Amino acid sequence: MGPGVTDWANAATSWLGYNATYPLTPCGYCNEFGNFTGVKDLVIQECTAQDGTNTVATHTFKVPRWRGFDNPFGDIWTNLDGVVIVRAAANEISTVYTTTNVSEFTDVVGEKTVAGYEVASDGYIKAFDLGETAEIIPSAVGGSTTTYICDYHYCNTSSTALRTLRVGGDALYGGIAGLGSFNSSGNGVGYAYSNVGFRTLNRVS
């Protein structure tokens, strides 16, 4: 799937200047691929940056669609509903709680169940802990951009706050981003920023 929408700098002459690190890819951009997999060019034309002074040069992204999902990684971070991560003490592994019950998509552990345990180290992922309902949770680091999982894990080992989970990476993360990129780096459950979003589902009856 190539680099996806992950290879733009966060600068006044690139992503920051273009739209202040908000999403780049229009919804449904790769719908022509249906439920299949493919890559489509997205061209950002040269324009004046938001500061009115700098120029944003033309940039071409390779937008991936994987089995019907646009941008399975990149563009912006995806915040996952129904996940709360808890670390009892600094530098210890974290417990990952999940649920598929929409009434439990809250900012507390509540009735969520333990899906697995997250390693207390940042780095390229070497192994996953696999949950009973297909959760993949980094259990070891020590890989690289070309070995093992090839995606990055952030966790902020000193944080003991309840944390949310972001996955995928955004438009400036390059080789750190990917399908398995896992970021619980101390961002509390109420974290919000321009480069973080979520996926929605439309049920057609």
Short names for language-model regions:
Residues M1-V119:
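Functional-site microenvironments in short loops/helix caps that host divalent-cation chemistry
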Residues W15-L16, E32, F36, V56, ...:
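C-terminal, surface-exposed recognition/capping segments
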